[in-house]
C-alpha cells in the first residue's frame, strides 16, 4: 500500500510482482517482465473493427495484450494480490477533431490454457506516467500524418478517375472501329462465346462499409503512378498498426470498380445479360497486370497475370472449332522408311504424336518405347494405319548409279584386248611375257616364281595388247580367279616336256567359269624331250579341243627362250580380239577392277587397277572397295606418269586412303561426300560380317574352354605382314589349309606394309610370331622386338614360309605313343622273401621278358595292374632278359598282390614325333 495519496511510490510489505493496469486505449512502448529479473520493450497497439451496419455501430474495445510488468525488489515473503481496479483510459484525438472515449474493458474469466494475469496496482509511478504521455503524443502525431496521407490519396484517386474516364472513352472509340472491321466475325463470336453478366447481389458482411458515393462499374484506369501506389501501400514509420494493418476503404472501392463489379458494401441489382466481344488488353493493361511487390500487397489475389495475345487467339480459335464441330483435314504424307527406324523418328516423319503410335502398338499387343528400333515392315504397317504412303529405301541405295551405266552404242569405240597368262608353276608364263615385252621380270622374282599379279601393255603391229601375269603356285588360286574375271582372253601356257599339271587344270576351270576364250601356248618346244602332241591329247581329257584336233581352240607352239613363234601367238590374240569385237566408251566416268594393292613407304597406298570403261584422270575422286581418295598420280608399267588412262590400260593409282582388296571394283564419283558415304557403308558391312563370323566361331567363353579341353585343339598365333594384298591373301589361304583337328594356325592380324611397333605390341599381347613376306621391320620395331623377345621371320618365297609354319605347328602336336609286344609269362608260384617282398616264380610262355620294360598283370583276362619290373632273376642272378621256355623270378614296383595263375604281359613303349 502507499504511504500517502500524493506519493506514487509503491511499497509492499511482502514479496509481490508489480504490474501496470492495462487500459483500453494504451499505446506506446512499455516494459514486460520475462521472468528471472529480465524485461523487454513491447509496443501496445489498438485495432479497429468495422461495424456491420450503421445502426449497429458500437464502440468495441479490442483485446489488448497484457501490460508490461515491472519487477519489484524481492521481499522475504509473498504478499496477497489486491483486486484489479480500472483506471480512466487516456483520450485519443481522432482526425476529425472529436475525442472518442472508449468504454473500459470488461473482465473475462481466464481460460484453462492461459497463463495467470499479473496483479496490477492502483497507482502508477512517474516513469510509467511519462511513458504513457509519450505514447499518447506519438499516437496523436501518427493520426495527423494519416489525415494528411488520406487527403493526398483522395487527390490521387480523383486524378486517376479522370485518366480512367479518358482511357474508357478512347477504348470505346477503338472498339467501335474494330467492330466495324470485323462485322463478319462478330456475329459468330457473339453467338459462340458465353454472355458476360453482372454478378449477383453480394451479401453485406461485417467487413462491408457503407459508401455514400458509389461509382459506376468501369475498367481499371489506364495509368497509375508507381509513387502513389507505393505511398498508399507503405505505411508511415510512425503510423499506428491499425492503419498499417488494413486496406484503405477507397482502394477497395477502386478495385471493385476496376474489376467491373460492384464496390464492397453495395447492393447492385442484376443487369440484363448482353454479349460482350472479348478484346485483347492494351500494352499498358498487360503491363499493369504483372506481379510486383507493390501490387502483391495492395491487390492480393485479385490481381492475376494476363495471358499473351497469341495464347488468347489460339484459345478463341479452339473454342470456335469446338462449337461449330470443325475437324482438321488429315494430311497424307510420303514417309521415307530406311531398313530400321526408331518410333520417335517415325512419328516425326509422319507429323504424328509418338504417344499415338505407342497407343496403336499397345493395341496390337506390343509394348514399346519411343526410342525402340523397329524394322521397315512394322514401320510401313504403322504408317499405313495413320493414312500415310511409304517409300522404302535401303542402305545399299548409296551404291546405285556408280556401276553398270548404260552407254549409247554410238559412243563405244574399239579398245585393246586384256589377256591373262595362266598355267602351272615353272611352265614359263613369266618368261614368255618377258620375251614378248623384251624385259627380264623373272630375274627380279624371288625363287624364280611369280608371286604377284603383273599388268603390262605391249604393242603389236600398231595395236596395243594388255597382258596380266598370274602366279602359278597353288597358293595363288584367288589371284588366278581374279585374273580370269578381269580378262578378255586367257593364254594357257603348258610345258611341252611336263604335260598337263594340277594348276593347269585349275586355270582351265577358272577360264571356263569366267566365260573367256582360251588360246593354248605349248611352251619349251626347244627342248629335246618336248612332246606337243602329248599335251594336245591330255587337253582333250579336260574338254579343251584345239584346232589341230578338230576343235575351235587356237594353239601355238612357242619357245620363250628362243622367241620362236611369238609373233604367231600375238596374231592369234589379235584375231581372237577381232572376233570378240571389244568396245568401250572413253567419254564417261571411269570404272574398273583392282588388280593388286600395296602400301609403299614413300608413296603410301598404291593400287594397280585396270580401267575397263571410261577414262581415269588425275584429280578425280574414286571409290575402291571400302576406301576412297582423290587420284594424285597415274603411273604406267614403265614408271611414267600419265595424264589419263583410257580403257584397257593398267595403271598404278596413288592417293587412296587405304589399300583396297585385290579384285574390288572401283568407280569415279562426283563428290567427296558421296565417296565417303559409300566407303562408310562398305566398312560397316565388313565390320558386321567380321563380327558375325567371330561370334559364330567364338561363342561363349565357357563353351570355348569346354571345346578346347574336350577336343584338345591347339592354336599357333601369327601376325603376317606382306608387300601386296594378293600375297597376304595367298599366305592366309595356304596356312588355313594346314590346320587339323588338333592344331591350327590362328592369324591374329594380316596387312600390307612394313612391320611397325604396333605389330610388335600386338604380337606380344597375343603371344604370336611375326612373319614378314617381302617386307622388313623398321629400326624402332626391331629394337622393340629385341627388348620384348619377339621373333620376326622374313621370307621371300611362299614355299619356305609355308614349310616353316608347318614345322612349327607340328611341334605343337602331342607325340604318338606306340606299344610293342615283347612276351608273356605265367605265374607258377608266389614266394615271400624277407626284405624283398613277394616274388612271382614264372615261366615265359611267349616271346621274352626284359628288365625295365612295361608289364601288365592280367587276371581272368582283366588287367589288374600296369607298371614296371623291379627285379628279374634267373636262379640267383640278375638278368636283363629271359627267353621263352625258361623260368624266372619277377617282382613289381609298388605292387605285391600276385596270385598263382596270373599272366604277366611284357611290352615296350615308344613315343614317335608327329608331323602335319
Swiss-Prot record:
Q: Where is the composition biased (Polar residues)?
A: 97-108
Q: Where is this region: G2?
A: 448-452
Presence of keyword Nucleotide-binding: yes
Instruction: Report the subcellular localization.
Output: Cytoplasm
- For region G4, the annotated ranges are 523-526
| One annotated GO molecular function | guanosine tetraphosphate binding
Please give the family membership noted in the entry. Answer: Belongs to the TRAFAC class translation factor GTPase superfamily. Classic translation factor GTPase family. IF-2 subfamily.
| Role description | One of the essential components for the initiation of protein synthesis. Protects formylmethionyl-tRNA from spontaneous hydrolysis and promotes its binding to the 30S ribosomal subunits. Also involved in the hydrolysis of GTP during the formation of the 70S ribosomal complex.
The protein's name? Translation initiation factor IF-2
The organism is: Rhizobium etli (strain ATCC 51251 / DSM 11541 / JCM 21823 / NBRC 15573 / CFN 42)
Name of the encoding gene: infB
Amino acid at each position: 500500500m502507499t504511504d500517502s495519496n500524493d506519493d506514487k511510490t509503491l511499497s509492499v510489505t511482502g514479496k509481490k510482482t508489480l504490474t501496470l493496469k492495462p487500459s483500453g486505449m494504451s499505446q506506446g512502448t512499455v516494459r514486460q517482465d520475462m521472468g528471472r529479473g529480465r524485461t523487454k520493450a513491447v509496443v501496445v497497439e489498438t485495432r479497429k473493427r468495422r461495424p456491420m451496419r450503421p445502426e449497429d455501430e458500437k464502440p468495441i474495445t479490442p483485446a489488448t495484450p497484457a501490460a508490461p510488468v515491472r519487477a519489484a525488489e524481492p521481499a522475504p515473503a509473498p504478499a496477497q494480490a489486491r483486486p484489479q481496479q480500472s483506471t480512466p483510459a487516456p483520450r485519443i484525438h481522432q482526425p476529425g477533431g472529436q475525442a472518442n472515449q472508449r468504454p473500459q474493458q470488461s473482465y473475462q474469466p481466464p481460460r484453462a490454457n492461459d497463463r495467470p494475469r499479473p496483479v496490477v496496482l492502483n497507482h502508477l509511478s512517474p516513469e510509467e506516467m511519462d511513458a504513457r504521455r509519450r505514447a499518447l503524443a506519438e499516437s496523436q502525431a501518427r493520426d495527423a500524418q494519416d489525415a494528411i496521407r488520406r487527403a493526398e490519396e483522395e487527390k490521387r484517386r480523383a486524378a486517376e478517375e479522370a485518366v480512367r474516364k479518358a482511357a474508357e472513352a478512347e477504348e470505346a472509340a477503338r472498339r467501335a472501329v474494330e467492330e466495324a472491321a470485323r462485322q463478319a466475325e462478330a456475329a459468330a463470336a457473339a453467338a459462340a462465346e458465353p454472355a458476360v453478366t453482372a454478378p449477383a447481389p453480394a451479401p453485406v458482411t461485417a467487413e462491408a462499409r457503407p459508401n455514400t458515393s458509389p461509382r459506376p462499374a468501369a475498367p481499371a484506369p489506364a495509368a497509375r503512378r508507381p509513387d502513389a501506389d507505393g505511398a498508399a501501400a507503405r505505411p508511415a514509420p510512425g503510423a499506428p498498426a491499425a492503419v498499417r494493418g488494413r486496406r484503405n476503404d477507397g482502394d477497395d472501392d477502386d478495385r471493385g470498380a476496376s474489376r467491373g463489379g460492384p464496390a464492397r458494401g453495395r447492393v447492385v441489382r442484376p443487369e440484363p445479360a448482353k454479349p460482350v466481344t472479348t478484346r485483347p488488353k492494351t500494352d499498358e493493361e498487360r503491363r499493369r497486370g504483372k506481379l510486383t511487390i507493390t501490387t502483391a500487397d495492395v491487390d492480393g489475389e485479385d490481381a492475376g497475370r494476363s495471358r499473351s495475345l497469341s495464347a488468347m487467339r489460339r484459345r478463341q480459335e479452339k473454342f470456335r472449332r469446338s462449337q461449330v464441330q470443325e475437324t482438321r483435314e488429315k494430311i497424307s504424307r510420303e514417309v521415307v522408311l530406311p531398313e530400321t527406324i526408331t518410333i520417335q523418328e517415325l512419328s516425326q516423319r509422319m507429323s504424328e504424336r509418338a504417344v499415338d503410335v505407342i497407343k496403336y502398338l499397345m493395341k496390337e499387343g506390343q509394348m514399346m518405347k519411343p526410342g525402340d528400333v523397329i524394322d521397315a515392315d512394322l514401320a510401313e504397317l504403322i504408317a499405313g494405319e495413320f493414312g500415310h504412303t511409304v517409300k522404302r529405301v535401303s542402305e545399299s541405295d548409296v551404291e546405285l548409279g556408280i556401276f553398270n551405266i548404260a552407254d549409247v552404242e554410238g559412243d563405244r569405240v574399239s579398245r585393246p584386248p586384256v589377256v591373262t597368262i595362266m598355267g602351272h608353276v615353272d611352265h614359263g608364263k613369266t618368261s614368255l611375257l618377258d620375251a614378248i615385252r623384251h624385259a627380264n621380270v623373272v630375274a627380279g622374282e624371288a625363287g624364280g616364281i611369280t608371286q604377284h599379279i603383273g599388268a603390262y601393255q605391249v604393242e603389236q603391229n600398231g595395236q596395243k595388247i594388255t597382258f596380266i601375269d598370274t602366279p602359278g603356285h597353288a597358293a595363288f588360286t584367288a589371284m588366278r580367279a581374279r585374273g580370269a574375271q578381269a580378262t578378255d582372253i586367257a593364254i594357257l601356257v603348258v610345258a611341252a616336256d611336263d604335260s598337263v599339271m594340277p594348276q593347269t587344270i585349275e586355270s582351265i576351270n577358272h577360264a571356263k567359269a569366267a566365260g573367256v576364250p582360251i588360246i593354248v601356248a605349248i611352251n619349251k618346244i626347244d627342248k629335246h624331250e618336248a612332246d606337243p602332241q602329248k599335251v594336245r591329247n591330255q587337253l582333250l581329257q579336260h574338254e579343251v579341243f584345239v584346232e589341230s584336233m578338230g576343235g575351235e581352240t587356237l594353239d601355238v607352239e612357242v619357245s620363250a627362250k628362243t622367241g620362236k613363234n611369238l609373233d604367231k601367238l600375238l596374231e592369234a590374240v589379235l584375231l581372237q580380239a577381232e572376233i570378240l569385237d571389244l568396245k568401250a566408251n572413253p567419254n564417261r566416268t571411269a570404272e574398273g577392277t583392282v588388280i593388286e594393292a600395296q602400301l609403299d613407304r614413300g608413296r603410301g597406298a598404291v593400287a594397280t587397277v585396270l580401267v575397263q570403261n571410261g577414262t581415269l584422270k588425275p584429280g578425280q575422286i574414286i571409290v575402291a572397295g571400302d576406301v576412297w581418295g582423290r587420284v594424285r598420280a597415274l603411273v604406267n608399267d614403265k614408271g611414267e606418269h600419265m595424264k589419263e588412262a583410257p580403257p584397257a590400260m593398267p595403271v598404278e593409282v596413288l592417293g587412296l586412303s587405304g589399300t583396297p582388296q585385290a579384285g574390288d571394283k572401283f568407280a569415279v564419283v562426283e563428290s567427296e561426300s558421296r565417296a565417303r558415304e559409300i566407303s562408310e557403308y562398305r566398312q560397316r558391312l565388313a565390320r558386321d560380317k567380321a563380327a558375325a563370323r567371330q561370334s559364330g566361331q567364338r561363342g561363349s567363353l565357357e563353351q570355348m574352354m569346354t571345346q578346347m579341353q574336350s577336343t584338345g585343339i591347339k592354336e599357333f598365333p601369327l601376325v603376317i605382314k606382306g608387300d601386296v594384298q594378293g600375297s597376304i591373301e595367298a599366305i592366309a589361304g595356304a596356312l588355313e589349309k594346314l590346320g587339323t583337328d588338333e592344331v591350327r594356325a590362328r592369324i591374329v592380324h594380316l596387312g600390307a606394309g612394313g612391320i611397325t611397333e604396333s605389330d610388335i605390341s600386338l604380337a606380344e599381347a597375343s603371344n604370336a610370331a611375326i612373319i614378314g613376306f617381302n617386307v622388313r621391320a623398321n629400326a624402332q620395331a626391331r629394337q622393340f622386338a629385341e627388348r620384348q623377345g619377339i621373333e620376326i621371320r622374313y621370307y621371300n618365297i611362299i614355299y619356305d614360309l609355308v614349310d616353316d609354319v608347318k614345322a612349327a605347328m607340328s611341334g605343337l602336336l602331342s607325340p604318338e605313343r606306340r606299344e610293342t609286344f615283347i612276351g608273356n609269362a605265367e605265374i607258377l608260384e608266389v614266394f615271400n622273401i624277407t626284405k624283398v617282398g613277394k616274388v612271382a616264380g614264372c615261366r615265359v610262355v611267349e616271346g621274352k621278358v626284359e628288365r625295365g620294360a612295361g608289364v601288365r598283370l592280367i587276371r581272368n583276362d582283366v588287367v589288374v595292374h600296369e607298371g614296371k619290373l623291379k627285379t628279374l632273376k634267373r636262379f640267383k642272378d640278375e638278368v636283363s632278359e629271359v627267353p621263352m621256355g625258361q623260368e624266372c623270378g619277377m617282382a613289381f614296383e609298388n605292387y605285391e598282390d600276385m596270385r598263382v595263375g596270373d599272366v604277366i604281359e611284357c611290352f615296350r613303349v615308344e613315343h614317335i614325333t608327329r608331323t602335319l
